[in-house]
A protein has these predicted regions:
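Long extracytoplasmic/lumenal interhelical loops at the membrane interface
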Residues: 184-222
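Transmembrane helix boundary and interhelical junction motifs in multipass membrane proteins
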Residues: 92-98, 191-195, 206-208, 277-279, ...
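Extracytosolic (periplasmic/ER-lumenal) interhelical loops and adjacent juxtamembrane/interface segments
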Residues: 171-190
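Hydrophobic alpha-helical transmembrane segments of multi-pass inner membrane proteins, especially
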Residues: 1-171, 213-271
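A juxtamembrane structural motif centered on a specific transmembrane helix
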Residues: 264-290
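Re-entrant/interfacial helical elements at transmembrane boundaries that shape
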Residues: 99, 195-199, 230, 272-282
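Short hydrophobic, aromatic-rich alpha-helical segments embedded in or entering the lipid bilayer
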Residues: 152, 174-178, 206-210
Length: 290
């Protein structure tokens, strides 16, 4: 069953990679439409990866020799996972990072050998540095990719802008400013009240990427703190239930899905308060379509 889910995931990712559509003004084609329904294949891939990795580790948990067989690693674990990662990342770097981070969390909980994890970390870090260096050395070679967007967002976050931002990143900068303004307004009493936000008219993704700041503006900083508290309670409850599960597969699936949800929540709130560069992550359970 996990192989069927993974193959379906790879198929939809290929579809989005080749002919993905744009929804809500986002520049990256992350969506596909099937029978009139639109969805992001990357979200489906996160679930597929969690189940796939959990099944592999559960299957070979008592036989380390088979688990570390190069043939099995290439065909039954790393190959499909890396293929999904490569298909996700060009259109959605933040989801790609959540994908690979969650994968490593599952490996750690599943007692995958640390030596292999550290080696793969080193390879990923080296690849990232090489990509960054290659872009800085020859930006024109990456003009038709999203690499300039990624680098610009990181550079503009850590270094004061030199006025050379693209139109897309200027829009993102304005949205972050509006989000911070909404949070600042929400820090005062009384708050704007339900449905009475002003900054939502300046945020093109007010109901998704910046919903947290709008909620703070409408329900005050207390409302924002309550939302964060709900996620903390959710984390504690799922963690307790995960370690009550008797089989390794169930434990890894619960921990993996929890990791995905909490990564999205942390990144979303971090972007809204200006702590991390702009991404396109929704607030789980709350954002429109989240």
């Amino acid at each position: 069953l996990t192989w069927i889910i993974v193959l379906l995931s790879i198929g939809t990712l290929l579809w989005a990679f080749v002919s993905g559509t744009v929804i809500g003004g986002q520049s990256a084609g992350r969506w596909v439409r099937i029978f009139g329904l639109s969805f992001q294949p990357s979200a489906f891939a996160l679930i597929a990866m969690v189940m796939f990795a959990a099944r592999y580790l559960e299957k070979y948990s008592r036989d380390t020799a088979k688990m570390l067989s190069w043939k099995r690693l290439a065909l039954d674990l790393w190959g499909p996972v890396l293929l999904m990662f490569v298909l996700i990342t060009p259109h959605n770097l933040s989801t790609g990072l959540i994908f690979i981070f969650t994968f490593y969390v599952i490996l750690l909980i599943g007692r995958y050998p640390l030596r292999h994890i550290f080696i793969s970390w080193a390879i990923f870090a080296a690849a990232g540095l090489c990509l960054y260096g290659a872009y800085k050395a020859n930006p024109e070679a990456f003009k038709e990719t999203r690499v300039p967007t990624w680098v610009a967002r990181v550079d503009n976050f850590f270094v004061k802008s030199d006025g050379k931002m693209s139109q897309e990143d200027m829009d993102k900068y304005r949205q972050v400013t509006a989000a911070k303004t909404a949070i600042a307004l929400g820090g005062t009493f009384p708050a704007a009240g339900p449905g009475k936000s002003i900054q939502k008219y300046f945020l093109s993704q007010a109901d998704s990427d910046f919903i947290f700041s709008i909620l703070v503006e409408e329900y005050s900083i207390v409302g924002g703190a309550f939302i964060l508290l709900l996620f903390v309670v959710f984390t504690i409850r799922v963690t307790v239930q995960a370690f009550r599960v008797e089989d390794l597969f169930g434990l890894l699936v619960l921990c993996g899905l929890l990791c995905v949800i909490m990564c999205q929540a942390i990144i979303h709130t971090g972007v809204n308060v200006g702590m991390i560069p702009v991404t396109g992550q929704n607030l789980p359970f709350i954002s429109s379509g989240g």
